[in-house]
A protein has these predicted regions:
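Interfacial helix-cap and linker-helix signal at transmembrane-aqueous boundaries
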Residues: 78-86, 140, 214-215, 246-247, ...
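C-terminal membrane-cytosol helix-exit motif in multi-pass small-molecule transporters
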Residues: 97-114, 132-141, 160-174, 413-421
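Transmembrane core module of solute transporters
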Residues: 13, 23-25, 87, 124-125, ...
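Short helix-capping/hinge motifs at transmembrane helix termini and TM-loop junctions
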Residues: 19-20, 52, 109-112, 144-145, ...
Length: 452
C-alpha cells in the first residue's frame, strides 16, 4: 500500500504540474489526496514492526510526529521559495524526486506487514464519512456568507449530522468496518484521539491565521511569511522526540495534558496581538508556546493510540491517528476561518459606516480582507488612511476570537488527557502496552475493557 500510494502520488503530481485547466488541476489534487491517504497511515504502521523495543518505538514515534508537524509548517516556506523563483507547477514537480528516493528506501528498508484479518473494503462507510465530513466542513465555511441560522446552513448541518450518524451506526454493525468504533469505548483511546484532533485543529487554524496576518496585515510576501513561521516548525520538530524521552519519566498524562495546556496559553497570549506587535519579542514567544505544547502532546498521544492495539492491528491505529489529524486540521481551518470571517465582517461594518463608504463597496470589502485592503487604497485620500486602519483593526478582532476558539479546544483536550490518560503505561515483554482494548476477533465482538 505504501509503495502503491507513493507511485500514485508521483503520477498525480506530474499531472498537476502540467495541468491545462482548473478542472484537471482539481482532479489531480483529488488523486493526490487519495494517494496521501494510502501513504500516511502506512508510514506510522511500520514503526511497531521495525521497533519492537518499547523505548526505541517511543523515540521513533516522536521523530515521526515531529517530522509530520515540521513538514506541515515548512510547506509555506517551500511553496513561497518555489513560486518566487519558478513557475507554479514546480510546487508539484518537486514531489517527484523525493518520492523516487522514498520508493527506493522503502523497498530496501521497510518490512512487509499486514493485518491477519483484513476484511473487505467498507464502501458504505467510506461514502458516508466522506460526504458527512465534507458537508460539515463546507457548511461551516459557507455559514458566514449565508448566515448561521439560514436555511442553507441549517440544512447543511442537519445533513452532515444524519450522514455521520449513519456512518457510526453502519460501522458498529459492519463485520469489516472502515473505522473500528468500538475502540472508542476505551476512554484512554478516545482521549488520545481527541487530543491529536485538537492539536491539529490548532495547528492548521494557527497556520491559517498567521499566514493572513503576515501577508495582509504586515504586508510580507509568501516566502517571507513562510520563513516567519520557521520558529514554530523548528520548535515543534525538536520537542516531539524529546517528549517521547520524557514520557518514560513524567508519564503520558502529564506530557499530553500539560502540552495542550501550554498550547492554550500560547493562543491566549496571541489573542492580545496588535497590528504593530513586534515579531521577535511577541509573535515568536507566542509561536514558541504553541509549538512546544503541541510537540509535547502529539507524540505521546500517537503512542497511546498505537499502544491500545496489538501489533498486528498497528495499521488500524495508524489509520485512526491519521483520520483524527486530517479531520482536526480540516475543521480547524473551517471553524477558525468562519469565526474570523464573521467577527471581521461585523467589526468592519461598524468601523466603515462612519466613513460613509458605499454599501456595495462595503459588501465587497467584507468578503475578503485582501480585497478590503485593495479597496481602501483606492478610496479618496481623506478616507483611505482610516479605512486601511479599520481593515487591520477588524482583522485583528477576528484573529482574537479565532485564538480564543483554538485555546478553548486545546484546554478541552488538556482536561480530557488529565482525566482519562494513564500516568504511566505498563509495557508487556514484547514492548506493547497492556490494559488496552484488543482487536475484534471471531470469538470477541468487542474490545476488552481497559484495566485501571
Amino acid at each position: 500500500v505504501l509503495q502503491a500510494g507513493l507511485v500514485l502520488f508521483a503520477a498525480a503530481s506530474l499531472v498537476a504540474a502540467w495541468a491545462g485547466s482548473a478542472h484537471s488541476l482539481i482532479g489531480a489534487r483529488g488523486v493526490m489526496g487519495v494517494a496521501a491517504a494510502m501513504v500516511y497511515p502506512s508510514t506510522l504502521a511500520t514503526v511497531p514492526q521495525v521497533f519492537r523495543d518499547r523505548q526505541e518505538r517511543a523515540i521513533a514515534i516522536g521523530v515521526w510526529a515531529g517530522v509530520s508537524g515540521l513538514a506541515i509548517a515548512l510547506g509555506p516556506v517551500a511553496g513561497g521559495a518555489l513560486l518566487r523563483h519558478f513557475w507554479w507547477g514546480s510546487i508539484f514537480l518537486v514531489n517527484v524526486p523525493v518520492i523516487v528516493i522514498a520508493l527506493i528506501a522503502g523497498a530496501l528498508l521497510v518490512p512487509e506487514s499486514r493485518d491477519p484479518e483484513p476484511g473487505r473494503f467498507d464502501l458504505v462507510g467510506a461514502v458516508t464519512s466522506t460526504l458527512g465530513i465534507g458537508l460539515l466542513v463546507w457548511t461551516i465555511i459557507e455559514a458566514p456568507g449565508h448566515g448561521w441560522a439560514s436555511r442553507t446552513s441549517v440544512l447543511g448541518f442537519v445533513g452532515a449530522a444524519l450522514l455521520l450518524t449513519l456512518f457510526v451506526v453502519w460501522e458498529v454493525r459492519s463485520q469489516s468496518p472502515l473505522l473500528e468504533i468500538r475502540f472508542f469505548r476505551n476512554p484512554r483511546f478516545s482521549a488520545a484521539s481527541a487530543t491529536t484532533a485538537m492539536a491539529f485543529f490548532g495547528l492548521f487554524g494557527f497556520i491559517f491565521m498567521i499566514t493572513l496576518y503576515f501577508q495582509i496585515v504586515i504586508g510580507w510576501d509568501a516566502l517571507t511569511a513562510g520563513l516567519a513561521t520557521l520558529p514554530y516548525a523548528l520548535i515543534m520538530g525538536a520537542m516531539s522526540p524529546l517528549a517521547m524521552v520524557l514520557t518514560s519519566r513524567l508519564g503520558t498524562k502529564l506530557l499530553v495534558g500539560g502540552g495542550m495546556a501550554v498550547s492554550a496559553a500560547g493562543f491566549l497570549l496571541a489573542s492580545r496581538a496588535q497590528t504593530d506587535s513586534p515579531y521577535w519579542t511577541f509573535i515568536v514567544p507566542c509561536m514558541a508556546l504553541m509549538a512546544a505544547g503541541m510537540g509535547l502532546a502529539t507524540g505521546p498521544a500517537t503512542d497511546a493510540i498505537l499502544a491500545a492495539l496489538p501489533a498486528a492491528k498497528s495499521g488500524v491505529g495508524s489509520a485512526v491517528n491519521d483520520t483524527t489529524r486530517e479531520v482536526g486540521g480540516a475543521l480547524g481551518v473551517a471553524v477558525v476561518g468562519s469565526v474570523m470571517s464573521s467577527w471581521y465582517a461585523d467589526r468592519l461594518t461598524e468601523l466603515w459606516t462612519p466613513l460613509q463608504v458605499p454599501r456595495d463597496v462595503l459588501g465587497a470589502a467584507k468578503d475578503s480582507v485582501g480585497a478590503a485592503m485593495s479597496i481602501s487604497k483606492q478610496l479618496p485620500a481623506a478616507v483611505s488612511s482610516p479605512a486601511i486602519s479599520a481593515v487591520g483593526d477588524a482583522f485583528m478582532e477576528g484573529l482574537r476570537v479565532g485564538c480564543y476558539v483554538v485555546a478553548a479546544a486545546c484546554l478541552l483536550a488538556s482536561i480530557a488527557a488529565f482525566l482519562f490518560l494513564p500516568a504511566h503505561d505498563r509495557p508487556d515483554p514484547e514492548g506493547r502496552h497492556t490494559g488496552h482494548p484488543q482487536a475484534r476477533t471471531p470469538q470477541s465482538d468487542r474490545p476488552a475493557a481497559a484495566d485501571g
